[in-house]
């Protein structure tokens, strides 16, 4: 169990590092966010199953619902930005541009 949780934590850290390094393109940022949500889902599921805490079995499902909503909103924003500007740069989302 310890090696699995270390691997999941490393996957979360790698996705966070990717989010910090590749923040210029929106698609790569969305993929890193999905990787973070997936590792959080797996880790929370493993913790709940190992502790046998039956009252919170719905927490990973709730996390998946929020991840799906985040992905849908992110993809809609990606389509809108790429249709308006032709690129998926995050700097196109700045409202202070002239």
From Swiss-Prot:
Subcellular location: Mitochondrion inner membrane
Membrane topology: Multi-pass membrane protein
Main location: mitochondrion
Enzyme Commission code(s) on record: 7.1.1.2
Enzyme class (EC, first level): translocase
UniProt keyword Mitochondrion, yes or no: yes
The keyword Nucleotide-binding is annotated on this UniProt entry: no
Record's catalysed reaction(s): a ubiquinone + NADH + 5 H(+)(in) = a ubiquinol + NAD(+) + 4 H(+)(out)
One GO biological process term: ATP synthesis coupled electron transport
Residue stretches in coiled coil: none
Keyword terms: Electron transport, Membrane, Mitochondrion, Mitochondrion inner membrane, NAD, Respiratory chain, Translocase, Transmembrane, Transmembrane helix, Transport, Ubiquinone
Superkingdom as given in the UniProt entry: Eukaryota
GO cellular component, one term: mitochondrial inner membrane
GO molecular function list: NADH dehydrogenase (ubiquinone) activity
Segments crossing the lipid bilayer: 2-22, 29-49, 61-81
Assigned protein family: Belongs to the complex I subunit 4L family.
Subunit structure: Core subunit of respiratory chain NADH dehydrogenase (Complex I) which is composed of 45 different subunits.
Chain's role: Core subunit of the mitochondrial membrane respiratory chain NADH dehydrogenase (Complex I) which catalyzes electron transfer from NADH through the respiratory chain, using ubiquinone as an electron acceptor. Part of the enzyme membrane arm which is embedded in the lipid bilayer and involved in proton translocation.
Protein's name in the database: NADH-ubiquinone oxidoreductase chain 4L
Organism: Microcebus ravelobensis (Golden-brown mouse lemur)
């Amino acid at each position: 169990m310890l090696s699995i949780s270390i691997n999941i934590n490393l996957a979360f850290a790698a996705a966070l590092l990717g989010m910090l390094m590749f923040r210029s393109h929106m698609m790569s940022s969305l993929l890193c966010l999905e990787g973070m949500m997936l590792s959080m889902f797996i880790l929370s599921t493993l913790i709940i199953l190992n502790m046998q805490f039956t009252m919170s079995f719905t927490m990973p499902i709730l996390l998946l619902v929020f991840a799906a909503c985040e992905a849908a909103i992110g993809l809609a924003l990606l389509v809108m930005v790429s249709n308006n500007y032709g690129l998926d740069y995050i700097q196109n989302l700045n409202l202070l541009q002239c």
